[in-house]
Amino acid sequence: MTDAPLILLAAGGTGGHLFPAEALGVVLIRRGYRVRLVTDHRATRYSGLFTAEMTDVVPSETVRGRTPWALAKTALKLGSGALLAFNLIGRLKPAAVVGFGGYPTLPPLLAATWRRVPTLIHEQNAVMGRANRFLAPRVDAIATGFPGHEIAWPVLASKITNTGNPIRPAVADAATVAYDPPAAGGSLRVLVFGGSQGARVMADIVPPALEKLDPALLRRLVLTQQVRDEDMGRVRAVYDRLQLNCELAPFFTDLPQRLASSQLVVSRSGAGTVAELAAIGRPGILVPLPGALDQDQFANAGVLTAAGGALRIVQPDFTPDRLAAEITALAADPAKLTQMAAAARQIGRLDAAERLADVVGRVAKV
């Protein structure tokens, strides 16, 4: 196996970047490649395919300000990371380097281009992020999670392949579970989460929204909610007072299974979340993260909403009254929930990791 070609996967240290890298890694290993992960220190929070022996941490930095000092600090950190990555790539001699977005991918991808190692980036979002925009003219190929990038970037169109967003094996397994619409008067299983890092807005809005539900509907509710540690006390106090059937945790390691068992999902709209909702086929109420320069989550939610699989509510409109009204309307219309689930499933890409592995093979020429 030591003679097998090595593919270096570079990803920012959050679930949104690491999970598709993991999904690709599983397929590449099955095809006979070796894989290693290059990332930042945050990745240690996420267990999965990449053990410590398969992981290299390279210094990196996100642009956090526009002052000369802030920019100089960022440039220095990225420069030191690129030098370390240059030496790492010289030692490992990978057949290709694949980037999954985020500033931590800049050092290894730039180092790979300097070493003339074949390069590929994967853009998970419906709009291209800043790190990938910087790398796009410099790499050999671009894979995308959503269609339309070739229209937005015609000068790059010849490099672009729409593969879809790779999903983890656990998500593919969950996708075999058929949607089970709520029966009249029966339980309504609702899953609420805010992405791999949680979201305070769910703790702020969901509890007062549930307080506004009709008591008969509240008794039907079976709630699973991701709640950050710092929000747990106040959220649990409301639900205890409501005598709500609920399970709360800061992070769910079995989220794909929980998605599969849910009948309605309320969440942010990161690329991974949208891809998993579509793959498994579950109706969603999506609340894009506001304030992002690229408005990527707004665009991601728009893809699923346009297909009929979700409702998109921008955060200023995501009020307790609005959420209570949407839950009430959907709970009363199981046929609508079933239609949304089917529409979401229609645009799901279960073979995205295989398609991306095909592109990697073409770029690496091994």
From Swiss-Prot:
This is UDP-N-acetylglucosamine--N-acetylmuramyl-(pentapeptide) pyrophosphoryl-undecaprenol N-acetylglucosamine transferase. GO terms for molecular function: UDP-N-acetyl-D-glucosamine:N-acetylmuramoyl-L-alanyl-D-glutamyl-meso-2,6-diaminopimelyl-D-alanyl-D-alanine-diphosphoundecaprenol 4-beta-N-acetylglucosaminlytransferase activity; undecaprenyldiphospho-muramoylpentapeptide beta-N-acetylglucosaminyltransferase activity. UDP-N-acetyl-alpha-D-glucosamine binds at residues 14-16, 125, 168, 196, 297. SUPFAM superfamilies: UDP-Glycosyltransferase/glycogen phosphorylase. Signal peptide: none annotated. GO terms for biological process: carbohydrate metabolic process; cell division; cell wall organization; lipid glycosylation; peptidoglycan biosynthetic process; regulation of cell shape. Cell wall formation. Catalyzes the transfer of a GlcNAc subunit on undecaprenyl-pyrophosphoryl-MurNAc-pentapeptide (lipid intermediate I) to form undecaprenyl-pyrophosphoryl-MurNAc-(pentapeptide)GlcNAc (lipid intermediate II).
